[in-house]
Amino acid sequence: MLSNLMSWQITLQIALAAAVIGYLLGSIPFGLILTRAAGLGDVRSIGSGNIGATNVLRTGNRKLAAATLLLDALKASAAAWIVGYFLGEEAAIIAGFFAFIGHLFPVWIGFKGGKGVATYIGTLLGVAPIMVVLFAAVWLAVAVTTRYSSLSALVAMLVIPVALLILGNEKVAAVMAIMTVISYWKHRANISRLMGGTESKIGAKG
């Protein structure tokens, strides 16, 4: 996979343009914008302090959390689609990756963003859409079995690069593998709680 990353034909100028566009789109903090617009205050002051959909759900507004999830996914998809249309497939992959980075480390709010699950899915939708079906299937299977949302996402993110590699899509597999590693790092507190048996389950109160 690493050798495939080195064999890309994209020029430095196009790669930089794709990265900047992707990052700026990914940096839009929809969770924060929506909760403030709804009069629910600063989502960073509750729960985990995260701007993602899971923390928005802690406000008690399910519709707002769903909207956050959708918009956080679509900003990565939009980055890949727009850049891909004008600059090509490799640029689309780069744009999706940097939209993911932008969500995790948004320039507008001090580089403190989400954990990247929604933008991971959005990037998949933009560059390898059939893989979204696999992600959803794995997530659902693990969630039904364990009732851990975080574990479901972690397992799904582990499966995706392997599946892409098996299917011969090595460029996307390599990038998604890097995104998986980064998201695992962002989920390190969840992983610690999972190992300690203290992670909250889906539907748990308090």
Curated annotation (Swiss-Prot):
Principal location listed in the UniProt entry: membrane
A GO MF term: acyl-phosphate glycerol-3-phosphate acyltransferase activity
Reaction catalysis annotation: an acyl phosphate + sn-glycerol 3-phosphate = a 1-acyl-sn-glycero-3-phosphate + phosphate
Enzyme Commission (EC) number: 2.3.1.275
Cell compartments where the protein resides: Cell inner membrane
Acyltransferase is among the record's keywords: no
Keywords: Cell inner membrane, Cell membrane, Lipid biosynthesis, Lipid metabolism, Membrane, Phospholipid biosynthesis, Phospholipid metabolism, Transferase, Transmembrane, Transmembrane helix
Transmembrane segments: 14-34, 67-87, 91-111, 124-144, 148-168
Assembly with partners or alone: Probably interacts with PlsX.
Function: Catalyzes the transfer of an acyl group from acyl-phosphate (acyl-PO(4)) to glycerol-3-phosphate (G3P) to form lysophosphatidic acid (LPA). This enzyme utilizes acyl-phosphate as fatty acyl donor, but not acyl-CoA or acyl-ACP.
Family assignment from sequence similarity: Belongs to the PlsY family.
Name of this protein: Glycerol-3-phosphate acyltransferase
Record gene name: plsY
